[in-house]
Amino acid sequence: MTIILGIDPGSRITGYGVIRQQAGKVEYLGSGCIRTSGEQLSDKLKQIYDGISEIILQFKPDLFAIEQVFMAKNPDSALKLGQARGSAIVAAVNAGLPVAEYAARQVKQSVVGTGAADKEQVQHMVKQLLKLPACPQADAADALAVALCHSHTQQTLIRMAGKVHGTARGRLR
């Protein structure tokens, strides 16, 4: 059993999603958003760090996956996003978690089947894959998609290792 924490970073809203991966199946554990307040970026970064640290204490994940920075039209926005990512990554590293990073297109490809999917398509597929009663908020859905992408990647690596080393139905022997 592996618990995966997925993060969709942002300087104003950072989404998080937690899933459990067991025997090739995934189960929803929780999701939400860390909403920062205040004018100073340093205060917002501390709020992100503290929020991620609390989530790590609550869910005790084994793995941490985060979306990479995309090239924004506004360089200032890209810098702030990078700093928000850094704050989240430091929280994970301080908790001893391994960190995996995925491009947004890779996450969408893994969850929806196309790297050009829009937010609504991601929300819908996350709802379907995790058997949720309703679509999660967009930032939380993106974070759950990151966690699902990491889960799919891990399962693929296990299957590939099995072809070399021998596995029983996708699980390491």
Swiss-Prot record:
Residues that, per the record, bind Mg(2+) 2: 67
Cofactor comment text: Binds 2 Mg(2+) ion per subunit.
GO cellular component: cytoplasm; Holliday junction resolvase complex
Cofactor: Mg(2+)
Leader peptide range in chain numbering: none
Presence of the UniProt keyword Nuclease in the record: yes
GO BP annotations listed: DNA recombination; DNA repair
Keyword Zinc recorded: no
Enzymatic class: hydrolase
Matches recorded under Pfam families: RuvC (PF02075)
Binding-site residues for Mg(2+) 1, renumbered to this chain: 8, 139
Record field: catalytic activity: Endonucleolytic cleavage at a junction such as a reciprocal single-stranded crossover between two homologous DNA duplexes (Holliday junction)
Superkingdom of the organism of origin: Bacteria
Places the protein is found: Cytoplasm
Molecular function per GO: crossover junction DNA endonuclease activity; DNA binding; magnesium ion binding
Its EC number(s): 3.1.21.10
Catalytic residues (UniProt): 8, 67, 139
InterPro entries xrefs: RNaseH-like_sf, RNaseH_sf, X-over_junc_endoDNase_Mg_BS, X-over_junc_endoDNase_RuvC
Similarity comment: Belongs to the RuvC family.
Cross-referenced PANTHER family: CROSSOVER JUNCTION ENDODEOXYRIBONUCLEASE RUVC
Known function: The RuvA-RuvB-RuvC complex processes Holliday junction (HJ) DNA during genetic recombination and DNA repair. Endonuclease that resolves HJ intermediates. Cleaves cruciform DNA by making single-stranded nicks across the HJ at symmetrical positions within the homologous arms, yielding a 5'-phosphate and a 3'-hydroxyl group; requires a central core of homology in the junction. The consensus cleavage sequence is 5'-(A/T)TT(C/G)-3'. Cleavage occurs on the 3'-side of the TT dinucleotide at the point of strand exchange.
Subunit composition and interactions: Homodimer which binds Holliday junction (HJ) DNA. The HJ becomes 2-fold symmetrical on binding to RuvC with unstacked arms; it has a different conformation from HJ DNA in complex with RuvA. In the full resolvosome a probable DNA-RuvA(4)-RuvB(12)-RuvC(2) complex forms which resolves the HJ.
Protein name per the record: Crossover junction endodeoxyribonuclease RuvC
Native source organism of the sequence: Tolumonas auensis (strain DSM 9187 / NBRC 110442 / TA 4)
Organism phylogeny: Bacteria, Pseudomonadati, Pseudomonadota, Gammaproteobacteria, Aeromonadales
Gene: ruvC
